[in-house]
């Protein structure tokens, strides 16, 4: 377990992620299970499947991908984020955009968020790729908001836990689907749009 969010701990967390490990990381909303999300590395390490197994989450429900800067999304999607939404970043706003080739051959979409937490953005930047993030809980159960609860339930199933204190009462991110030049709020969270 890491108890300090600093430059060294960001490097350590990134090293775990780059090796295909699953980490519990604090975000600007709640604690999240995280793993490397870059397509070729994810396939090599199976991070998606590892997180799904821990959570008991069905395969058709995708994970949010966290990016280190809003500009990073242009690597994966040609969709332009409307200025009114872009102004909310970094922060607890998740946008769902279509993926471009070669990341998707079908009309697939992905949910991206640029978190407000600078330490977490440094971890992601150190990885060099987006990372998955999904709330720390078993599917269908309440989100765990304290490291004590997380450690008790998941310490034998994850490779690293970063302690940033309790996240009691934290709201999840707001999720917005972008399409046809407009957007639709799918989940109202801590950011008002």
Give residue spans per PLM region.
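Active-site-adjacent structural elements in enzyme catalytic cores
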Residues: 1-193
